Amino acid sequence: MDKKNDHKNNLIPQPASSFASSQERPTPMMEQYIEIKAVHHDSLLFYRMGDFYELFFNDAIEAAQALGITLTARGKHLGQDIPMCGVPVHAADDYLQKLIACGYRVAVCEQTEDPAEAKKRGSKSVVRRDVVRLVTPGTITEEKLLDPTRANYLMTLSRIKTSDGEDFALSWIDISTGIFRVTESRQEKLLADIMRVDPQEIIVADAFFHDKSHKSLFNVLDHIVSPQPACLFDTLTAERDICTYFKLSTLEGVADYSRCELSAIVAAIRYIEKTQITHRPPLMQPERQNESATLFIDAATRLSLELIRTTSGQRDGSLLKAIDRTVTGGGSRLLIDRLIAPLTTPSAIDTRLDSIDFFLRNPSLAEAIKLVLKGGPDMPRAVSRLALGRGGPRDMATIQRGFEIIRELNQILNNELLPQEISDVQQIFSNLPVSLHCHLEQALADDLPLLKRDGGFIRSNYHKELDEMRALRDESRRVIAELQAQYAQETDIKTLKIKHNNILGYFIEITSTQASGLTNNPQAKARFIHRQTMANAMRFTTTELADLESRIAHAANHALTLELEIFDTLVQEIIEQVEFIRKAAEALAILDVSVALAYLAEEQGYCRPKIDHSLTFHITAGRHPVVEQALRKQAAEPFVANDCDLSVQENQQYAAIWLLTGPNMGGKSTFLRQNALIAIMAQMGSFVPATSAHIGVVDRLFSRVGASDDLARGRSTFMMEMVETATILNHASHHSLVILDEIGRGTSTFDGLSIAWAAVEYLHEVNHCRAILATHFHEMTALTEKLDRLHNVTMKVKNWDGDVVFLHEVTPGAADRSYGVQVAKLAGLPPAVITRATDVLHQLEQGEMAGKGHKLIDDLPLFSLKATSSLNEEKNKHDALHEALKNIHPDELSPKQALEAIYHLKQLEKNNGL
């Protein structure tokens, strides 16, 4: 994940102790920078200087290039200019976002004392600075840096060697919402578990990262992995450190974590303490994820089915994009959680389906809830920012607005006969902390600043002393105006002004030509004290003005101090209610997802699936959810629905396997994918694109659809296919669903046929799983005579005037041929090539290939003279038509001539057989 410096060594700052003489030593400020940078050598250092974060040396070179900002220089080091660039503090979030996206870590170094305090230690004293946080991809909380629709997970991956091999555990945290989960894993499913969570950053121990036996894993994960010292994962004090963080006396009764799980949990906590430094985000206690409670989907299957993103990394075209009708960030994140981890317990799935059913039967209620939820605030992320000291008044308003929505929704749901899941939601809403809600309503002003340091966020009449200080501060404007009028009259200088800046404070300003009246008159000179001479003006003050300034400054400063004290009190009250806020936010997300899936079902005509523990897989008129919507948007032909029945047949113990044949472009891959997606949608607790669906819970879903090279690891398409097929054959159970497309296509015909043949037999005889297998080997259709649970189905086609029409219908039986030449014709290959291919195919089909290679070469010479002549004839026909079109000038033709030209073109077409 970390970017490596690759510049010359003379751009790397040397510590002050390495210099031979004091003349060579860097300035005190640069000494301080070098000391801090040495501690955070693996991060870009944002070094606060006034209103800017400055970067020096290699950091400046890399940041300037990554951010597209100007690279300049400041001072010298070892006789060379020190590269420097900077970004404004007020715009730092935008620059941080770019750096994090480029894979950098950033150490944010702030001034920890006021410059005035530093001067008390001596005129050359440097303002104290220290790093207050490390910004990494997995630990960001700023609203600008986060995608509201996506969780931002930091994952820790722990490994403990045992006498039997290796134990693995994963923990993952979203510090922006407080989610904290942990699970054990195994080497063969490690990548699948990681891909399911989809973390932004992964923490591993150095030794684990550099272990050659796991090199392939970390090659896949690439830049999101951050190796850390082994001490981060040490379990010696793990229980104590975990208890300290969560303020527990013991972990007994909380969870019986394994040693490997403890290692993953404590590593996450220590890394958060390391990066957040002075603050602790309010995290929920680690929740253990039960492996058997969710549908296992391996990494290759997730990629090929394009659940969250397409293979090119885009959200458009994914299943998520097709089904997401949520209106809140929390709802969108929950929908993703459900989509990446479908359930395997029918009762839990039915609980979710009951909620959707309820809103389908109560559309007016669903509409009312949707209107209230729309654009609802993200309370957990606001709480996290407040707890970490990065929140502002608007984050408090987010909590207040969230409470208002909860109160309104509680009233809407009250007195309704609710399904279990929605009833639980309503119960949570009924526990709204009314006192905190009222406190926030009374305290917060209507128009809030972004930053608390700007003040003005506490409502008038909320705090008596604050109102008094504000009155004095605001009244001063009138007093200053009166004093200005008095001085103007007293000096007879009508243009005299009282102004203010941060250097001089309040001062009297007159033009240089008018200054003699104050500087030459002894009485005026004693009263008006000279402060500054400008090119065209002179500035003065008076004892009276200085006293007034002191009173105003005190009032303004004291007013801000009081506001900040009130802010801190409110933050503490909010943090005390963090458990309710977290549960309420989850309840809001559940409500959003339930209503959204009801809208989806109504809009797309989806049905409620029947889910049980059987081996049934019976889909009536199933459709592909993504392709169907894409066709509708294009106003194209409607999607052709197809049945799929892999259920246990009479007198059979296990479910069926379908062997699918048919032409390319006939819809085989779409049919394969749609059934896998229907299974996922059903088990995530959604209605599905079908007329009816009965699905026995799938424990593992395997999908091998589409070619994928793995060039980075030196694997070809065929090698990848074999690795993925091996995973399927080694791990599929009789409750699994397997989707395989064109197994064995990446090698010779006989090798491929042999592998496909053996794989089908193994799935039938050993795995006993439900499966749909597409193949271009027509010889395999004979297997149905040998394997009683294997059934031939094919994609229906129709011949029309020598052309093939794909009907996209799945029917019983086997394909009579491949229709490859017809597909080539549709793709636009030249007519001569199509004619030649048809001749070659005809001769090949007349006899067996084996033993007749030389005869075929003689019979089928490469584009013979006759063929070449045909090509020339074809070209001449097109040239004649092209010439006729060139000679037509539409603007010069009469209606009769235009009609004659059309007849001429039609005759050319007929004569040339075009």
Curated annotation (Swiss-Prot):
Q: Which SUPFAM superfamilies match?
A: DNA repair protein MutS, domain I, DNA repair protein MutS, domain II, DNA repair protein MutS, domain III, P-loop containing nucleoside triphosphate hydrolases
Give positions of region: Disordered: 1-25
One GO cellular component term noted in the UniProt record for this chain: cytosol
Give one GO molecular function term: ATP binding
Task: List all Polar residues biased stretches.
Answer: 11-25
What family is this?
Answer: Belongs to the DNA mismatch repair MutS family.
The record describes the protein's role as: This protein is involved in the repair of mismatches in DNA. It is possible that it carries out the mismatch recognition step. This protein has a weak ATPase activity.
| Entry protein name | DNA mismatch repair protein MutS
